[in-house]
Amino acid sequence: MYGAVDRYNRANGRAVGRGTSDAGQQLQQTVDRCRFRAAQVLGASAKEQIVFTLNCTDSLNMILHGLLTPGDHVVTSVAEHNSVLRPLRHLEATRDVTLTLVDVDDAGFFDAAEVEKAIRPETQLIILQHASNVTGAIQPVEDVGEIADKHSVSFAVDAAQTAGHVPLNVEQLGADFVACSGHKGLMGPLGTGLLYVAPGQEKELTPTR
């Protein structure tokens, strides 16, 4: 990774998607190749489902601010990272979004059945971590994916701690959105992140910038 960044800074330095020079085309091919490899690692069916972001927090904010509207209800857990809980509290205060925080046991695990019980008619989103960086608990997100599908509720997974460390297949998770950090298990540079968007779900997101 260091070598690739160094070569870019020394020998290319162009902006992706701008210009038709040989160096610009080479850079575009490199980015396309990275997107394809990221899709392979995450088990996505197409590279177009991968969005490059600033970091995992940025990916999560794109979901929360791009999906939720006044009156929506969100199910999450008390064990989520501040990158989820703080934006949700902000939306609760400014956008009339309501929250249900499912509890966890002494080992840090939530119960998928409790997640299902928290669903209401106005529930728009379930957002949960794949694993905790505090307890190490790897959560039963596949079970929640089935529940979300049954109730036609959008499902987002925070995979900041697992992408690149734990086998991860976004389609098996049944997730509509998966947010990842680029600089942790995926071993990319700081200031990078990924957002997986399931086919068709891009129509549900309002651009945030």
What are these regions (language model features)?
Residues 1-209:
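Pyridoxal 5′-phosphate
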